[in-house]
């Protein structure tokens, strides 16, 4: 077992031709974040001293997307094989550290497997991650003598006998910095592909008398790479199935685990119920006894105890205290805050607005840049007119206010406590406590009125 410090190299220079996309392959998302970010996160969780990212195609987009402080960007201008990629990073290796080699398009590698690989690496030798496949066609085969790993033969260079070997190379390995630099300097491209294979260092290490220890991953999906969108979609479902299983075992009721997506992290209380086709993105917190209806999307939000979110509601960057009810078809945009027992009904939109304790906005309403007190009733069709074409302005509504249907509050405006606003009113001035306000035009009756007749 090695006790050395460790750095990680992530190979991410491939074009991803089979993705048929202008986006670099490793930036295609799995569970809401780029594939390569999953690998970077694993490296950081392992406590890597540095992460060397070998890039080529789409370097500008990679730099715009990835903002890790400890990333060292290494350019591979020509893609001449995995060994060539590692040669570009080699000048940054310290002799006394271990180097772990990972891939930006193998997103589900687990920290636990990598910890076992690191622990298994012999002093002066190599730790190698391998798997056995029923059909190993196309993969490099692991050769052994008396049970000991002696080398890796790529499929195109393998003999018929070697092609019968089922144990294959995943490409993930760990070796000492000084040894790795020495072996990389000896690589040649005398092979069927005309490339520099990192796998050739296995035979070099064996010839020098160093031990190579093979470790198997916990699950095959951990080492599955992505070369096309079909493979990416399959890994997405594998990942989501794993997350759903963990949540079910932790006490979350998923009505259909196959129709649930977690694209971030979820902290949850007890007796949480989640219906079908729900998507959770970013960092989501659900309190005890929260119920989420079918088709909801919740992103970067905290939902308090006993809240119920009815179907097809969207909640983003919002905060809900206990016992709030939302939807169906409600939209809470960034900055929405509901205090205890508040209700937002169907086709109500909130942004940068706070709804007080026990207050209700039941139907067809827009509340933006607003502070609304406790026990307020917002009638159907109410709009806070917060934008004058250049700037946003605030609406403040006190406690115990009744706002009638089809009311427009033209900000900036303040409504005092206990105010009653009649239906159809346009509020343009501040209102003192306990006033009744109405601004309707006189109702006109025209007897004997005849509707226009359509011309034929």
Swiss-Prot record:
Pfam families: Hexapep (PF00132), NTP_transf_3 (PF12804). It is found in: Cytoplasm. Residues 1-229 are annotated as: Pyrophosphorylase. GO terms for cellular component: cytoplasm; membrane. Keywords: Acyltransferase, Cell shape, Cell wall biogenesis/degradation, Cytoplasm, Magnesium, Metal-binding, Multifunctional enzyme, Nucleotidyltransferase, Peptidoglycan synthesis, Repeat, Transferase. It comes from the Bacteria. Binds 1 Mg(2+) ion per subunit. Gene3D superfamilies: Hexapeptide repeat proteins, Spore Coat Polysaccharide Biosynthesis Protein SpsA, Chain A. InterPro entries: Bifunctional_GlmU, GlmU-like, GlmU_C_LbH, Hexapep, Hexapep_transf_CS, MobA-like_NTP_Trfase, Nucleotide-diphossugar_trans, Trimer_LpxA-like_sf. The active site is at 363 (proton acceptor). GO terms for biological process: cell morphogenesis; cell wall organization; lipid A biosynthetic process; peptidoglycan biosynthetic process; regulation of cell shape; UDP-N-acetylglucosamine biosynthetic process. It catalyses: alpha-D-glucosamine 1-phosphate + acetyl-CoA = N-acetyl-alpha-D-glucosamine 1-phosphate + CoA + H(+); N-acetyl-alpha-D-glucosamine 1-phosphate + UTP + H(+) = UDP-N-acetyl-alpha-D-glucosamine + diphosphate. Catalyzes the last two sequential reactions in the de novo biosynthetic pathway for UDP-N-acetylglucosamine (UDP-GlcNAc). The C-terminal domain catalyzes the transfer of acetyl group from acetyl coenzyme A to glucosamine-1-phosphate (GlcN-1-P) to produce N-acetylglucosamine-1-phosphate (GlcNAc-1-P), which is converted into UDP-GlcNAc by the transfer of uridine 5-monophosphate (from uridine 5-triphosphate), a reaction catalyzed by the N-terminal domain. This is Bifunctional protein GlmU. It comes from Klebsiella pneumoniae subsp. pneumoniae (strain ATCC 700721 / MGH 78578).
């Amino acid at each position: 077992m090695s006790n050395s410090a460790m750095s990680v190299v992530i190979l991410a220079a491939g074009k991803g031709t089979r993705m048929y996309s202008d986006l670099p392959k490793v930036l295609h998302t799995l569970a809401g974040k780029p594939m390569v970010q999953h690998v970077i996160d694993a490296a950081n969780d392992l406590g890597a001293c540095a992460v060397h990212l070998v890039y080529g195609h789409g370097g500008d987009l990679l730099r715009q997307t990835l903002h890790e402080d400890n990333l060292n960007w290494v350019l591979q201008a020509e893609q001449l094989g995995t060994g060539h990629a590692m040669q570009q990073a080699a000048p940054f290796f310290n002799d006394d550290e271990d180097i772990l080699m990972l891939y930006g398009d193998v997103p589900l590698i687990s920290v636990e497997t990598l910890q076992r690989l690191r622990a298994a690496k012999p002093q002066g030798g190599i730790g190698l991650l391998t798997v056995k496949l029923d059909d190993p066609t196309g993969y490099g085969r692991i050769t052994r003598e008396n049970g000991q790993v002696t080398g890796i033969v790529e499929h195109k260079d393998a003999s018929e006998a070697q092609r019968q070997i089922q144990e294959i190379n995943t490409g993930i390995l760990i070796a000492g910095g000084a040894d790795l630099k020495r072996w990389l300097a000896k690589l040649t491209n005398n092979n069927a592909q005309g490339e520099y294979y990192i796998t050739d260092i296995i035979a070099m290490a064996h010839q020098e008398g160093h031990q190579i220890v093979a470790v198997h991953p916990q699950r095959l999906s951990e080492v599955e790479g992505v070369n096309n969108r079909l493979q990416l979609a399959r890994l997405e479902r594998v990942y989501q199935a794993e997350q759903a299983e963990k949540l079910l075992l932790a006490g979350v009721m998923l009505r259909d685990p196959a129709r649930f997506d977690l694209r971030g992290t979820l902290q949850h209380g007890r007796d949480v119920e989640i219906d079908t086709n729900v998507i959770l993105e970013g960092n989501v917190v659900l309190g005890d006894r929260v119920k989420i209806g079918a088709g909801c999307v919740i992103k970067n939000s905290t939902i308090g105890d006993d809240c119920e979110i009815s179907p097809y509601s969207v909640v983003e960057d919002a905060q809900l205290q206990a016992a709030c009810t939302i939807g169906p078809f409600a939209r809470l945009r960034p900055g929405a805050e509901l205090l205890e027992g508040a209700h937002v009904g169907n086709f109500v939109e909130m942004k940068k607005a706070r709804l007080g304790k026990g207050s209700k906005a039941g139907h067809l309403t827009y509340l933006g840049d607003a502070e609304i007190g406790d026990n307020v009733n917002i009638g159907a069709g109410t709009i806070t007119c917060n934008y004058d074409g250049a700037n946003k302005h605030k609406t403040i509504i006190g406690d115990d206010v009744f706002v009638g249907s089809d009311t427009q509050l033209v900000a900036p405006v303040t409504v005092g406590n206990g105010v009653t606003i009649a239906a159809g009113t346009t509020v343009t001035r501040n209102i003192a406590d306990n006033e009744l306000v109405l601004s309707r035009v006189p109702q006109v009756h025209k007897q004997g009125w005849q509707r226009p007749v359509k011309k034929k």
